[in-house]
Amino acid sequence: MKNLILAIESSCDDSSIAIIDKNTLECKFHKKISQELEHSIYGGVVPELAARLHSEALPKILKQSKKYFKNLCAIAVTNEPGLSVSLLGGISMAKTLASALNLPLIPINHLKGHIYSLFLEEKISLDRGILLVSGGHTMVLYLKDDANLELLASTNDDSFGESFDKVAKMMNLGYPGGVIIENLAKNAKLKNISFNTPLKHSKELAFSFSGLKNAVRLEILKHENLNEDTKAEIAYAFENTACDHIMDKLEKIFNLYKFKNFGVVGGASANLNLRSRLQNLCQKYNANLKLAPLKFCSDNALMIARAAVDAYEKKEFVSIEEDILSPKNKNFSRI
């Protein structure tokens, strides 16, 4: 019975392939190879290196999934947004597979995929607010009951996750910065350093991390010898201020929209400080909080496969001749 969908994710620095049963939503296969170690010496993702590593990793993963090929009914792939050279690797493989196996091709928006990480084993439920925080995006969305997406707030500059990466790089801590800063902050012995919360007195529903990032840079310059205790203190102050900023704007949004259901997705949503605060916020406003599983917060092909199940039912197929590569976020108005 041909009831399986194979999905490929390669939008940034994770090479991943998943296979899902479109009828039961059972994950039949999922494998991810991260490039974090290779990029860590540069303090961030190097696009050309990412592309080369995808070209090595994706075929290795695909080979492990071959036993499911006879039961495939479609091929899905992340086509937007992301690094062009990274996306291209996944798209090329998906088109080759779709052509060779004579299967329909389904392009999936990466951010939609993150939303589906809330519903990996269940039908998607609408009418909810969503916070998406990752290395490339910070936004609050309203997923309406007609499946339309309304953008309520986004960042004016850096993303939440990106700011962690950049602060980690300033202190020569490595990459990715999220977990490094979070763990370092737990070791803070002194808590005398503080930063102003961005846009605290602004009514604008938007995020901005560039000013906070610069404040951290100036604080670092005050110290001739940046020892581990000072690094931990800076990490603590930065993490808490970044979370303060997210919660400050979310509080304003909750007051306006009175959400009964709220979801949190994206790689940076794995931050435990942020998760704890979100739980408190939703308790305060009597909203049901749904968090993406920690294992599937970061980029993965299973969320792409899950999104593809619904896209398959709607017959959202494209020709393999069509140019579907889009580094920018074009198709993101509906689920």
From Swiss-Prot:
Fe cation binds at residues 110, 114, 299. InterPro entries: ATPase_NBD (IPR043129), Gcp-like_dom (IPR000905), KAE1/TsaD (IPR017861), Peptidase_M22_CS (IPR017860), TsaD (IPR022450). Its main location: cytoplasm. Its EC number is 2.3.1.234. Its cofactor is Fe(2+). Substrate binds at residues 132-136, 165, 178, 271. GO terms for biological process: tRNA threonylcarbamoyladenosine modification. It catalyses: L-threonylcarbamoyladenylate + adenosine(37) in tRNA = N(6)-L-threonylcarbamoyladenosine(37) in tRNA + AMP + H(+). GO terms for molecular function: iron ion binding; N(6)-L-threonylcarbamoyladenine synthase activity. It comes from the Bacteria. One of its GO terms (cellular component) is cytoplasm. Keywords: Acyltransferase, Cytoplasm, Iron, Metal-binding, Transferase, tRNA processing. Required for the formation of a threonylcarbamoyl group on adenosine at position 37 (t(6)A37) in tRNAs that read codons beginning with adenine. Is involved in the transfer of the threonylcarbamoyl moiety of threonylcarbamoyl-AMP (TC-AMP) to the N6 group of A37, together with TsaE and TsaB. TsaD likely plays a direct catalytic role in this reaction. This is tRNA N6-adenosine threonylcarbamoyltransferase.
